[in-house]
């Protein structure tokens, strides 16, 4: 049973601390810390993609405040695999925290190097690749790995032996027993379990999905059938990060005498990195530039492109709008959607499919009748299998929203793990592991989300986002007041409204606001309560905003962004 930590019971004992910077009660920005005495090791540093209401924001990363404050303790960053929600925050981390060494699988290491090169002020000291047999040791920690099956090659779970017990972080995984060399290493998992797993930090993304997930082999067979029967060009879109599937699709295409055309930056980058490190064996002659596809018969072309989520600027959407410079869709084309819409993207994907349909193309989507996509995350029976193999003393669900975490708690109960031995946490909440027992502590680290705009990250962006949301919803209202050198208001304040309401249709209200603002400001000036011009200006702006806000809310039920400009001549 997980108990509350009582310092009086552990005088002279040093706890192993476990916490999440991000990745708990959410899907994205995965980042976890394990700390003992004078050492901190980090597992993953991901990004979370911004929702549509976060206007102008490219992504969200965890706060690194705890690491900045404890810089001398930071010893290493370990990466489970190369997906964006696990490595996308690394360049921003390297700008703020001195990381002595990053340990990563081959493809993740290559992707990180490329990211760092795009961020000139990110300082990378050292990056070391690891595999199934690697072991690393710090003063207090011993770390090794086990291979897992996921939608990207070189994916791993991480085992950390600490002075207070053994912690296993699952990484992202699934069981696909037809995956060959990329199959989850059950034998290694059993060996790790024999050491005793005291805390298992398990992903929970697909905890609500019953049964076992479909094998990728079924997906490949269905895609192969479509490719074989297609008489024209085949345009296939999937997640550019799903390198395992992309590799198989390329092999299927080559076996059907089709050249490969890569469209979209992330697709091009991921394929070329995979080729460079030997994960894809594709001859350069089998890849054609988009401007050259016209030189080949349509039946000999496969276009692999981005845009499976209906992204506006992605290659497939550009084609659907008839705006692509090199690819014009025609009725003989076949479109394969080898993906599912992520929650929040359903409308964008439906709109994309409607636009594609206008060209008369054949469209194949993933469905229960035709499987063209399988998730890379463990479903209920796969989670049960892993929990039975690991059989941890304590479980901390991660990598999922709260309802997913609660569901894996129920699954754990069915596997013999008691509810009181499962910790449903929040980001920033610190757990203590002492003598192989887990405790709730009162310690909290800062886990506020940090927003990214272009390549810049700042806590101040949260305030800017709020302003943008107000602008998009209620518009902007500006008040310009001109004073003479004796603080007398010259004329009537000028009012400007944008996106709030039509000024021409609201002349009486605009007149009322202008005169009320003038009277209110004059009463402030006449009170003579202020010792400095700065104090007076601050108070004038405050009462001006209050006055305008009152009238607009009362008459228009709007709450615009109010800007006041005070000028003295």
UniProtKB/Swiss-Prot annotation:
Tagged with keyword Manganese: no
Ligand binding (Zn(2+) 1): 81, 83, 150, 172
Annotated binding of substrate, by residue: 373-377
One record GO biological process: rRNA processing
The keyword Metal-binding belongs to this UniProt entry's keyword annotation: yes
EC code: 3.1.-.-
Binding site for Zn(2+) 2: 85-86, 172, 399
Molecular function as annotated in GO: 5'-3' RNA exonuclease activity; RNA binding; RNA endonuclease activity; zinc ion binding
GO cellular component annotations of the record: cytoplasm
Subcellular location: Cytoplasm
Enzyme class: hydrolase
Pfam families: Lactamase_B, RMMBL, RNase_J_b_CASP, RNase_J_C
Cofactor comment text: Binds up to 2 Zn(2+) ions per subunit. It is not clear if Zn(2+) or Mg(2+) is physiologically important.
Function: An RNase that has 5'-3' exonuclease and possibly endoonuclease activity. Involved in maturation of rRNA and in some organisms also mRNA maturation and/or decay.
Oligomer status and interactors: Homodimer, may be a subunit of the RNA degradosome.
Protein name per the record: Ribonuclease J
Record organism: Mycoplasma genitalium (strain ATCC 33530 / DSM 19775 / NCTC 10195 / G37)
Gene responsible for this protein: rnj
